[in-house]
Amino acid sequence: MAEKENTKRNRREEILQALAQMLESSDGSQRITTAKLAANVGVSEAALYRHFPSKTRMFDSLIEFIEDSLTTRINLILQDEKETFNRLRLILLLILGFAERNPGLTRIMTGHALMFEQDRLQGRINQLFERIESQLRQVLREHKLRDGKGFQHDETLLASQLLAFCEGMLSRFIRSEFRYRPTQEFDTRWPLLAAQLN
């Protein structure tokens, strides 16, 4: 029984990995059909549906992986790092680095891969980025409590500016067909971003 569960779990992971790889390839700029995905995995469409009731559930699983990966690591950053600017830098670097290591998932994070899918999938990605922006805003607000001084501009504006930088770098990554890495020149860009906060 346990062996059967492991086989099923492995097949599910294989399907999700194939979908992520297709999103990374030139197929990712077009709608990915279950027929194409099944052919890529080497199974029938019926076999796909034994593991996932719909393509939407496949995307849900990939979004869940993105959410878990980012939120878990952001929480670790907030737990381990207390200095405001280091927290912000590490969170941005996390988002950019995750995208760089997972190009196919970057198409989901930017919404490119979801254009032909159910609206609620884009809603989940929107909620993820809203949560990240909220965490950035909280880090900025805690700076005032911790250091006794705030920022020249409103924390909401600053948090959205930082997140917009990340989103722009992810879009550039896709537009360049994954040639322009999101973390490229980050060490040069960070002081420019940090200067905007003061």
UniProtKB/Swiss-Prot annotation:
One MF annotation (Gene Ontology) recorded for this entry: DNA-binding transcription factor activity
Coiled-coil residues are 117-144
Which residue ranges hold the DNA-binding region?
33-52
Q: Record's InterPro entries?
A: DNA-bd_HTH_TetR-type_CS, Homeodomain-like_sf, HTH-type_TetR-like_transc_reg, HTH_TetR, NO_SlmA, SlmA-like_C, Tet_transcr_reg_TetR-rel_C_sf
Q: Which GO terms describe its biological process?
A: cell division; negative regulation of division septum assembly
Subcellular location, principal:
cytoplasm
PROSITE patterns found in the cross-reference section: HTH_TETR_1, HTH_TETR_2
**Compartmental location:** Cytoplasm, Nucleoid
Q: Where is each HTH tetR-type domain found? A: 9-70
Question: Does the entry feature the keyword Ribonucleoprotein, yes or no?
Answer: no
TM segments? none
Among the entry's GO cellular component annotations, what is one? bacterial nucleoid
Record text on subunit structure and interactions: Homodimer. Interacts with FtsZ.
Fetch the NCBIfam families from UniProt.
PRK09480.1 (NF007015)
Sum up the protein's function in the record's words.
Answer: Required for nucleoid occlusion (NO) phenomenon, which prevents Z-ring formation and cell division over the nucleoid. Acts as a DNA-associated cell division inhibitor that binds simultaneously chromosomal DNA and FtsZ, and disrupts the assembly of FtsZ polymers. SlmA-DNA-binding sequences (SBS) are dispersed on non-Ter regions of the chromosome, preventing FtsZ polymerization at these regions.
Q: Which family does it belong to?
A: Belongs to the nucleoid occlusion factor SlmA family.
PANTHER family on file: HTH-TYPE TRANSCRIPTIONAL REGULATOR RUTR (PTHR30055), NUCLEOID OCCLUSION FACTOR SLMA (PTHR30055:SF183)
Q: What is this protein called?
A: Nucleoid occlusion factor SlmA
Organism field: Pectobacterium atrosepticum (strain SCRI 1043 / ATCC BAA-672) (Erwinia carotovora subsp. atroseptica)
Classification lineage: Bacteria, Pseudomonadati, Pseudomonadota, Gammaproteobacteria, Enterobacterales
